[in-house]
């Protein structure tokens, strides 16, 4: 997992509440357990005018011109700005995989569904909860300013607007440490690799019948 320390990224505004995981990545694309390759089908039913299928070439599919992420000014966005209860619905780790593969590294919202919130941290995405008033102000600024970027400083726990105004956010200390160091569940386990090897070696001596 890549480290997350500081990001200066273009912001895309998804002005919707209760965006569920089926909207983020529809169910027909859940057959793969690889973490990559889901980006082209993120928000598939909103991005395209037809129904997508796994393995389909998306280059010729008609795009929905009214969907915000299809607008040229938001191409390459790394920060997603949205409303309350983002990531609700069924539990699927494919949802953060799709968002990360699409290019998003941070999501700013009024609130998140608990399981989705946890899955973001496990996959290197920083979910940030801000008060509704701050969210509303950001929406107004993003929509009024082409090329609007935010600095997301995890070390300082602040979202910094172009005018220099910093908006503090809270994050669990352990999750912060994991993102700063790029530790996912496997990375955390590998930190104890030497002790694991020592345990396995001792176990082979103490319980040799398990390995015969």
Swiss-Prot record:
Pathway: Amino-acid biosynthesis; L-leucine biosynthesis; L-leucine from 3-methyl-2-oxobutanoate: step 2/4. It is an enzyme of class 4 (lyase). Keywords: Amino-acid biosynthesis, Branched-chain amino acid biosynthesis, Leucine biosynthesis, Lyase. It catalyses: (2R,3S)-3-isopropylmalate = (2S)-2-isopropylmalate. GO terms for cellular component: 3-isopropylmalate dehydratase complex. InterPro entries: 3-IsopropMal_deHydase_ssu, Aconitase/3IPM_dehydase_swvl, AconitaseA/IPMdHydase_ssu_swvl, IPMI_Swivel, LeuD. Its EC number is 4.2.1.33. One of its GO terms (biological process) is L-leucine biosynthetic process. Pfam families: Aconitase_C. It comes from the Bacteria. Signal peptide: none annotated. One of its GO terms (molecular function) is 3-isopropylmalate dehydratase activity. Heterodimer of LeuC and LeuD. HAMAP family: LeuD_type1. Belongs to the LeuD family. LeuD type 1 subfamily. Catalyzes the isomerization between 2-isopropylmalate and 3-isopropylmalate, via the formation of 2-isopropylmaleate. This is 3-isopropylmalate dehydratase small subunit. The gene is leuD.
């Amino acid at each position: 997992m890549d480290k997350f320390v500081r990001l200066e990224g273009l912001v895309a505004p998804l002005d919707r509440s209760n965006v569920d995981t089926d909207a983020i990545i529809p169910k027909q694309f859940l057959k793969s357990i690889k973490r990559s390759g889901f980006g082209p089908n993120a928000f598939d039913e909103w991005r395209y005018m037809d129904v997508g299928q796994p393995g389909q070439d998306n280059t010729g599919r008609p795009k929905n011109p009214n969907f915000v992420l299809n607008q040229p000014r938001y191409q390459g966005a790394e920060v997603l700005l949205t409303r309350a209860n983002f990531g609700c619905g069924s539990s699927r780790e494919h949802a953060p995989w799709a968002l990360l593969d699409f290019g998003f590294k941070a999501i700013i919202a009024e609130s998140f569904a608990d399981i989705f919130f946890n899955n973001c941290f496990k996959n290197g995405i920083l979910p940030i909860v801000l008060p509704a008033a701050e969210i509303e102000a950001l929406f107004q600024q993003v929509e009024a300013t082409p090329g609007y970027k935010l600095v997301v400083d995890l070390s300082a726990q602040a979202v910094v607007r172009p005018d220099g105004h910093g908006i503090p956010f809270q994050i669990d200390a352990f999750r912060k440490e994991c993102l700063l160091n790029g530790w996912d569940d496997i990375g955390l386990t590998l930190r104890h690799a030497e002790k694991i090897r020592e345990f396995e070696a001792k176990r082979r001596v103490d319980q040799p019948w398990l390995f015969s």
